[in-house]
Structures are given as structure tokens and as C-alpha cells.
Amino acid sequence: MRFDKLTTKFQQALGDAQSLAVANDNPYIEPQHLLLAMLDDAEAGVGGLLARAGVNVPALKAGLKQAIDRLPRVQGHGGEITVSRDLANLLNIADKIAMKLGDEFIASELYLSALSQDKGEAGRLLKEHGGNHASIQAAIDAVRGGESVNSADAEGQREALKKYTMDLTERARQGKLDPVIGRDDEIRRAIQVLQRRTKNNPVLIGEPGVGKTAIVEGLAQRIVNGEVPESLKNKRLLVLDLAALIAGAKYRGEFEERLKAVLNDLSKDDGQTLIFIDEIHTLVGAGKADGAMDAGNMLKPALARGELHCIGATTLDEYRKYIEKDAALERRFQKVLVGEPSVEDTIAILRGLQEKYEIHHGVDITDPAIVAAAELSQRYITDRFLPDKAIDLIDEAASRIKMELDSKPEAMDKLDRRLIQLKIEREAVNKESDEASQKRLKLIEDEIAELSREYADLEEIWKAEKAAQQGSQSIKEEIDRLKVDMEELKRKGDWQKLAELQYGKLPQLEARLKEAESAGDKGEAKPNRLLRTQVGAEEIAEVVSRATGIPVSKMLTGEREKLLKMEDVLHQRVVGQDEAVSAVADAIRRSRSGLADPNKPYGSFLFLGPTGVGKTELCKTLASFLFDSKDHLIRIDMSEYMEKHSVARLIGAPPGYVGYEEGGYLTEQVRRKPYSVILLDEVEKAHPDVFNVLLQVLDDGRLTDGQGRTVDFKNTVIVMTSNIGSQQIQAMATDDYQVIKLAVMAEVKTQFRPEFINRIDEVVVFHGLDEKHIQSIARIQLKSLENRLAKLELSLQISDEALALLSEAGFDPVYGARPLKRAIQAELENPLAKAILAGKYPPKATVMVEARNGQLAFA
């Protein structure tokens, strides 16, 4: 017979049989070799077919191995191994059966049919282990499903649904799906579409994370529980794995064959199977090559006729981008819009999921944590959607507590490290024999004994707490498994067994859980001394703070005191601007105490004043105060935005322009660091159109970038600086602050539009600096020089006369404090640099600076 008439799987099995014969030094390929090779190939399906026919497959494999060991061996046989006469006869019989059935190719199961009638060793073993001809023939008919084998890969296309889909209803039966809370309207609308005569294919469209896949899981749970109309009862809901369909399709037409096999299996089911395709937009263009059809086009006829009950899910953007472009595909689906749930609905969803997450992590999730997760995620995580972002917070906070439970508590870890340190020291001191060393050794021994006792006490408490926690955890898991069993019994209608579990075993387990939890409470004088086992609102706030950089968690006492004394801290670097410092400090205190308007930035200020009086310095100081670093200061020099088109640099270029994908400078910075100080320096130099962009930022705390994404500015402090009104401030230096402010505001109104000024929280006028202020600034500047000298192991002492001389040299009422820096460089740093290079000051020396004859003198 011709071997090219065998199917691909049969040819592979024959090749494997040849390898078996070679490995065993057998001169011929016997029927036993071929049958064992078929059983060893898990993908061939022969093992499953024989199991269906009632054959004990493991015992058969063991018998075949023994039979092969008894076959004659030929050492050093270098010739080609050929098919034995017995196997050739069996293959010819299989060929005859194939002709009778009208098959173009000989499939593996026909060899089994021939073998079941054979009287040789392999046939005898098959019968011995339960394989009679009638049962094997019945199993073959069931697997073939009345179809002919007309392609070499026909065996690979069998049971396509099993290979390329996952049964969601089966997972629901096993209790592996999360409970679906709410979403009744969307599920009802999907059922309504599924019951139509034609085009009965709903597609769920919504933003990422709103719960589209959860709706399908909810439908699977309702089908399992029988909470659906009669026409949907007992149906299967399968998830199509498109990646598995495409994976390994090497030749043209292979992907199409697989998809056709899936569609054929579905059509055989007479509408008893619903298919769910997640990310349905991937169908468009899937498997398309030159001249080939893509998956979307192959599905269209079945979708239109109503043969294929398909549920799709995709996001709004991808639906518009892929599905809407293909009008023929779009009309075959009915849209079901899935909106973002409200905060209240999200809280209900989280309460439903609470038990699953508690069992998974082995921690308790409190109700305040659930409320905090919904509210904080809605307020601070603006670029994602509920309920996904709230679930993420709960999951991460619980994961953090679980990680702490699995590792050694911090208090014990510190003691452990200290003990190791002392033991090393003891070994070193032990080698010394003098009296001082012996005294030190005695002290070390005493400390080690004391710390060891403390460590042992803590370890005992830790073990007790951990044991209590693990005990209650195992009971919770048992209760969860029991509830799944009860649901299954309820579906089967086994009321007697259900009553036994519900009124017998379940109350016992709940009583044990209550006992374990109450015992834990009594046994601990200080509850949770070492282990945190609860996720509270504070833990959720910590996760939000870590993810966004926004301080959401409760203020510690130290931070409260720091905020109350904020003016003093700012005055350490900003001299003589009391009104400005107070305005900024009040804005920060409002935000941290929770009184600030949540829909606006923390504060928006316009700083007006002459050059060099501390406008920019105050912003830098504020950033350092809030974040302990200047990195969170987003500084934009508005002199770079003098042209009309430069607005695009702030928010990103519009579609069609170069740089569209890159995003805007301001919007990208704020997206990465939502909690920051934004400094718009020299704001009057920008083009008037730039201010139009800032209007919505100042009013609503939001800005839409070039790509249509909304960027949240609600956690920023916006400061604009300008030199407008400098001349009036200089001229009216001695007048009252309010009089100066009115005069400056008159000039501001000529420069900026009323709607822009009206949106700014406070316009702050900075005073010009007098000689006393300059002297204070000189001290601050010299402090910086002292720090630089300290790195060189030098110290600096400057007399009051020398300081006055420097201040006088650096005082210029027009230019503010900037000339002072230049004066310090020229009068102090330059001569000092020469002296250091000349070797005048060795390490640990003190540089004395005094005033002599109107000049600075070094000693």
C-alpha cells in the first residue's frame, strides 16, 4: 500500500514506531510498536478513543512494553528497518475499511478497527484489556461523527471545540468564577439579543476595566443556575482562544481549516453552544495573507444566518477603529454599551468580591477599606476606570499585608541583626585578655542574654498569632469549598444531601471559625502586636500614595507640626515676602486638611514683583518642603512660548502634525507626577493664546491633551510669575501693601483678560528688597558656601563687618538679590579659590573673613 495515503498523524505514529524498533534493536516494525507509538502521542486522540471504548489504557501500555521486550533482537543491524508482514496485513485491512467508508486518507482509528479483529499479539493484548470490536467500532463512529476523512490533517480538526475553546459554564459549575454583582440591565439586554431569530450576536462595548468580561461570566453563572429564559437553559458558553487557533498554523489554509472545524462543530450542536470572543476586534485581519480570507469574513455568513450564537467584547476605541470600518461585520452584531459603574455600585461589587480576595490572601478586608478603595480610586486615579482600579487597590493592599505575614516581623528582624552583631563582637573581644576587654565581654554577654530573652518572647507571640491566623484561614477555605458543593447539589436537586451540609456541616464550620477568631482576640493582650491581618482604609491610602505620589494617607503628628510651622520653613530661604509665603502656606494647609475644593488645583497664584525678589525661589522652596526634592517642580519658561503655534508644545501636537505621538511637555509631566508644583515663569512673555489653554486648568483642574486624554491637575499647585508692575512697586516702596497692590492690579488688567485674572486664587505682590533683607539673604548664600567648604574639610567664619560690606556691594534696589550672588563670587569666592589652590589652608583649617579698609581680608 502507499504510505502517502496515511493521515499526517498516522505517518507521525509510524515514524515513532520505527524509532521504538531501532531503540529496541528489533529488525521489523511490529503492530505492537505502532500501537504503543499511537498511545504515547497525547495529541493523536487514540488513547481517548480507547478509553471511551472501555479499554484500560495504562494496563494496555504496560502489556505492550512487555511484549516489545520479548521480540527478537538483532545486534549491529545496519540495514533499513521495514514493516513486518503482520503490520503490512493490518495496514492493508485498514486501507480496505477506508475505501468502504469513502475516505481519501487512512486515519489512525481504522488501524484500531483492523487490530480489534486481528488474532496476533497486539490484537490479543487489546482484547485482553477490554477492547472488543463492537465497543471500539462504536467509539470510532462517535469520534468521526459521520464525516469522511478527506484531508491529511482531518484528525487534527477533530474535537476542535475542545482544543480551541474553554468552557465557561463548566468553570461556573466548579465555582472558579468571581461573583458578578449588579450589571442586571446589561446581562438582560445581552440575553434579549441572544434570543433573536437572526443577528442574535451581542457585542459588549465599553472602556477598559468597566467589567465587560465579567458580564459574560455573570451570564455563564445564570445559565448554570437556571436563571435564564427556557431557550438559553442548559446551553454551553465557550470562550474562543483565537491565539491557539493561529499558533502553529505554518501553511496557508491551516488557520482557515481550524476555524472551519470550529464552525462545523458549532453548527452540529444545533444552537446549544454560545461562543464568546474577547477582544473581538482581533478577528478583523486575523490569519489574513495574500489573497486569503480573514477570520472576520469567514464568520460573517454563520453570524448572518443565526447559526453562530456569538458574544463579543471590545473597547470603544477598537470598535470604532476595526469593527465600524467593516460595515458588513458591524451590522451582524448588536451593540450593548457597558458604562462605568458609580462609586456606590463599585462598593457593592467590592463587597461581593470581598470573600474571594480574603480567602486568596488569607487576610481580613474591612468595610472602610472597600469604601476607601472606591472613593480614593475615583478621585486620584483618573486615567483608569471603575471597578477595575478599585479592585486593584484592594488586591495590592491585601497582597502587601500577605507579604508581611509571610516574612519575619520588623521588630524581630532588628533584634536578630543586633544579636548577630554582638556575637561577632564577642568572638573578637574573647581573644583579648586585658581587664578592659574582660569587662566589655561581660557587658556583651549580658546584652546578648537580654536580647535573646526578648527575641524568644517575641517569637512565641509571633508563632501564636500566625497559628491563629492560619487556623482561621483553613476554615474559611473549607467553608468556601462547601458552598460550591452546596450550589452543585442545589442544581442537581439533591435536597437531602444539601440539608445535611446546610444545617449540619456548615454551622459546625462557622462555629469553629468564630471560636478560632474569638480565641485569637482573648489570647492577645495587645491585639495584632506583631502581625497585621486586616486591610483597612489606611492601607488602601498607602497604596494610592505609592502609585500616584499624592499624600493621601493620614498625617502623622510630625507632619501636622511641620504644616503649622510652614511659614518658618519657607522664610529660611525666602526673605521679606510675608504675604506671598502666607498665601502659599494657607493653600497647602487647606489641601492637606481636606478642605480644598476637590475639583480645582490646590492653589493658583500670580506672583508679581521686580526681578530678583524671590518669586522663583519661593516655588523651589515650596517643592523642596512638600517633596523633599526639587524634582517635583515642573518649571516652564514662558518666554519659549511667544508664538501662537507653541501652545502645541504644552499639550501636544494635533493629529496629522509631526510629534503627535509624543504628547505635550506640560500634560506628560503632570500625568507622570500628578502631585507637583507647576511654575510658569515670566508668564507675561507668552502668546495670549497660551492663557486660553490655562483657563480650564485654573477653573476645573483638568486639561485635554492633543490625543484627547484628560489630564488631572487637581493635585497641583500652579504658580505664575511676572515682572508686570515692577516700576510701580519700586516707586511706591514706602507705601502700604494694599495701595501698591491696587496700583499693580491696574496694570495687570491691561495685560491679561478678565476671565484669566478671575480664575486665579490670589494675586500676590512681592516687595522690593531693602538692605536689611539683603543682609539676611547674604547669610543664606554664605551657608551654601560653608557647606561646599565643609566637603573640603574647611570651615568659614565671617565677621559682621565683612557681612555688611558684602551686602552693601551686592545691594541694588532695581535688580534685587541677584547682584549679591555676583558680589559674593567676585569679593569672596575668587580670592578664596586662589588661596586654597596656593595651599594656604590645609585640611581642618578655619577661613577667617574680616573687613579692613573697606576691603575683605582673609586670615
Curated annotation (Swiss-Prot):
GO terms for biological process: cellular response to heat; protein refolding. Its main location: cytoplasm. It holds the Pfam family Clp_N. Residues 3-146 form the Clp R domain. Residues 769-859 are annotated as: C-terminal. GO terms for cellular component: cytoplasm. GO terms for molecular function: ATP binding; ATP hydrolysis activity. It is found in: Cytoplasm. ATP 1 binds at G206, E207, P208, G209, V210, G211, K212, T213. Residues 6-71 are annotated as: Repeat 1. Residues 559-768 are annotated as: NBD2. Homohexamer. The oligomerization is ATP-dependent. This is Chaperone protein ClpB. The lineage of its organism: Bacteria, Pseudomonadati, Pseudomonadota, Betaproteobacteria, Neisseriales.
